[in-house]
Every structure is written in C-alpha cells, then in structure tokens.
C-alpha cells in the first residue's frame, strides 16, 4: 500500500488586482512586473476573508471530489504562514466548520514549501496504517503581510488555497520519493520585519531557489528510480517565471511539461504548488500513471520536492 491523491479542490478570492491596478498606487509598470516575474494579476482576499475561510472552501471541494464526506476524514494538515492566531490552528477551525467530528487537525509551517511538507507528512500516516483519509491544504492570505510601500515585493504576492485528499493507493502509484530540507542560516534573507511585513533579499533567495530546487529535483528522480524523460509534468513553486524556467531547464524538460499559474495568481506561498496542481488536474494536464514532480522553496530557508505517480 502507498499514499496517493484521491481528490483536489481550490479557492481563490473574487477580487482580481492587475499590474495596471498596481501602476496607480506605486512606482511600477505592467511591463516591469511581467518581464521580471511573469505575473499579470493576482487575487486579493476581502478584509473580512481570512486564511481559514480560504482553506475551508478548498478543503470542502477536495473532499467532495474525492467522493468522501467530512465524517470520512481522519486528519487535516494545513500548511500556512498567515494564521489569524497562534491557536487554534487553521486545521482545527476548518475541522469544526466542516463538521468532521472524527478528524484531528494540525498546521505545518515551511513557508512556500509548506504544501510539500504537508503531503509528505500525510503520506507517512497513511503508509503506516495510522490514518486512512487525510486532507492537506496549502492556504495563505499574503496580502495581510505584504508591505504595499515596497514595490519590489508588493507586486509578487496574492491570496488563495489549494487542497488534496490523500488516501491509500496501490504500491506502484502515489508518493514515489521525496526530499525535504532546511538551511536556517538563510533565514535572514526572507522573513517578517519588525512591522510583521515580508522582507526579502531577492538576489540571495533567487540563488538559493535555483540551486536547491534543481538539486532536490535530481535527488527525488534518483530515489524514485526515474530518468528526467520519465517526468510527465513539473509543478514548481509559482514564485517567479525565471526561477521556474531554470528548474525546467535543469531537468531538460520541454516547455509543455512546465505547469504555470504564476501569471494569474502570483506567489501565493503555501498554496502556490497546491493551486497549480489543482489547475493541472482541472485542465486535464495529468492522467493516470503520469509521474508528477512537485518542488518548492520558501522562507526558513526551506525546500521540498516529491514525485507522485498519479492514479490508484
């Protein structure tokens, strides 16, 4: 028995903020943003819309798409950096709202790599037989910790949530390999400043991301016994088109094997990879027996990569 994905779901706020909207409030331009990041627009949550609201909506859809009910869920794992409070966890809030009376809940925090950490954690519970059905959510409301006076970072971020239901699948499907890591010495390059707003040293983060995403991708390929050409889809953290393209080139993959959502969502941190995965499923980009590589990096500094063979 292995652990795989049984259903997916997402939620993005209704409000769309384009690059042209940002031109009106800061010294930037659509051309400057697009050429450097690949971002054209992003979703921004309402003031009264919180991370747990985004996570709840995505989880609800994923459970339905898995053909399950909230009573079938054993555990909720939410990857996020924008909890409204230290406790209760976002996972506990959505467990209550969904009426999932049989489930436990916990949050994990590995910034933009958090969703990969959540998926790997869930897989261990399932493979040991401790739990059967686990909801993993990546959700963040980055707009509340964005410094809107810093044009170098304000143009990057958006809000949203993506979710998967994980459960038992056959030995030759599901999670084939993973690589999780941290380099705490780089924490100074990406963190929250004294005003609880995002600070980023873009040059250092770029170097770290390109290096670690590439190396982690090669490690999970080796551990899964796969070659680069065996990959059917690469879903990287949607931070910046240049970083994403560097990841694709490191693996010698054609353009059509790179999943891109950065243009319409921006960088949504913990939900970034999850949203891209859900869109790939909805667009028919993933079929049974496909080998899908998820890879990301985040504040910490952290990184996570994993390969899933789609299907049951």
UniProtKB/Swiss-Prot annotation:
Instruction: Give the keywords, sorted.
Output: Acyltransferase, Cytoplasm, Fatty acid biosynthesis, Fatty acid metabolism, Lipid biosynthesis, Lipid metabolism, Multifunctional enzyme, Transferase
Give the UniProt subcellular location, in the record's own words: Cytoplasm
Quote the Pfam families the UniProt record gives. ACP_syn_III, ACP_syn_III_C
Quaternary assembly: Homodimer.
Q: Which SUPFAM superfamilies match?
A: Thiolase-like (SSF53901)
The organism that produces this protein has a lineage beginning with: Bacteria, Bacillati, Bacillota, Bacilli, Bacillales
Q: Name one GO cellular component term.
A: cytoplasm
Q: What's this protein's name?
A: Beta-ketoacyl-[acyl-carrier-protein] synthase III
Which NCBIfam families does the record associate with it?
fabH, PRK09352.1
Species source reads Listeria monocytogenes serotype 1/2a (strain 10403S)
